[in-house]
Amino acid sequence: MKAWYKLEKHHSQLFIMYSGELEVQAKRKAIAILQDEINRILNAGRVLSTLPKMLVNKDKAGIKVALEQIASIEEEVENLRRKITRDVADVGGLILNRENILNTAYTMDEIGGYITGIAFKLSNIKVSTIKTSHLDKDLTELIELVVDQIYKLNEIIRSLNVDSGKSIELAQETQKIERDIDTKYRIMTITVLNGITDTKELLLMKDVIEAIEEMADKCQEVSDSFILLALSLWFERRIIRK
């Protein structure tokens, strides 16, 4: 009886270890796709940051190329989101926190959509409006702050499979960047309201800076999701080692 009990216990432990290893493998595959997704979003953000200067310089060819690049990247991000949805569906209940992974993929997809929307609205604002109170420089700085935030997300996900603790530290840095973005956003809002008299132009510019701030909020949501993934991976590694 004791021998049978020990054998059953041994088999149960092996099954738990095997299931745990499979889950970690499935999660690593999902994280690799998320990393691919965030890389593309980072590239789109960098292209977006060049747009204000091109608009001021009336670089029509450059603007056209930038808008095409951003639209193409958004499509790539959507395809990656569909891929991760299929992959997570295929493994079924193997990944315990699959909802978190899917939500992260969809939120990153939204960030890609924000970049496309901002680029479109920005390209339809008059040059004279963008030059108001040096808004072109302020816009570039605001977008670059969000690009810094996305870059941090890229660093976080790169460290997820290597050092979960490092991921959590990096996630805290995104919060500081978000606070800087909020401060810059408030200052720019006052500048826009005081400096732009044309109603249509005012609404367009206000929409642009609000969308940039909302995009930063979405980046913070992704950062929070990465913390949950980091904690999950750390916990699973502890179980497998035991």
Residue ranges and their predicted role:
Residues K2-K242:
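Cytosolic, long alpha-helical scaffolding segments
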